[in-house]
């Protein structure tokens, strides 16, 4: 039995969020294949620490154990992480950045101690991560802002194995469609990813 944690970083209300609807479908398909797995959700929009941005004025406070350990221990306690991360102004949402700043902590989720070549060693090698990303523009329009690539790099840095589901063109290809309507044309991909997760 695996423990799966869904991280919702969408700044859009659930019923209007393309990425959230894809994630709920992924959850449903995943549980059909893994009915005994335990699923929980963390909505970063509801997390007080999710709105605490790292600045020069609060860096000591930001990295205090009581601020980072609960979030780090939460991902250490699960086997799989599903990250809902729509492109927002050419990046992932600010709440996700704030959360990542709290879980990417030296000697807790990565280390330089035992590296032979001066690089880092990820300490979260037990973790499988599925990134669910949507963007309004078609694929390739904004190569400098590929949220999936950015997040893949961050999670691989801490040692995780990473896969992704990306749906591009929600403001073009899927224009005038409701979030639930983008699930159907992407259902085969979602089922395939759920099967291999």
UniProtKB/Swiss-Prot annotation:
An example of a Pfam family matching this protein is Flavodoxin_2
Q: Provide the E.C. number(s) assigned to this enzyme.
A: 1.6.5.-, 1.7.1.17
Q: Which reaction does it catalyse?
A: 2 a quinone + NADH + H(+) = 2 a 1,4-benzosemiquinone + NAD(+); N,N-dimethyl-1,4-phenylenediamine + anthranilate + 2 NAD(+) = 2-(4-dimethylaminophenyl)diazenylbenzoate + 2 NADH + 2 H(+)
- Record note on cofactor: Binds 1 FMN per subunit.
For this UniProt record, the keywords arranged alphabetically read as follows:
Flavoprotein, FMN, NAD, Oxidoreductase
Q: Which domain of life is it from?
A: Bacteria
Q: InterPro entries in the record, alphabetically?
A: Flavodoxin_fold, Flavoprotein-like_sf, FMN-dep_NADH:Q_OxRdtase_AzoR1, NADH:quinone_OxRdtase_FMN_depd
What cofactor does its activity depend on?
FMN
Residue positions binding FMN: 10, 17-19
Molecular function GO labels: electron transfer activity; FMN binding; oxidoreductase activity, acting on NAD(P)H as acceptor; oxidoreductase activity, acting on NAD(P)H, quinone or similar compound as acceptor
| Primary role | Quinone reductase that provides resistance to thiol-specific stress caused by electrophilic quinones.
Q: Tell me which family the UniProt entry assigns to this protein.
A: Belongs to the azoreductase type 1 family.
Assembly and partners are described as: Homodimer.
Name of this chain's protein = FMN-dependent NADH:quinone oxidoreductase
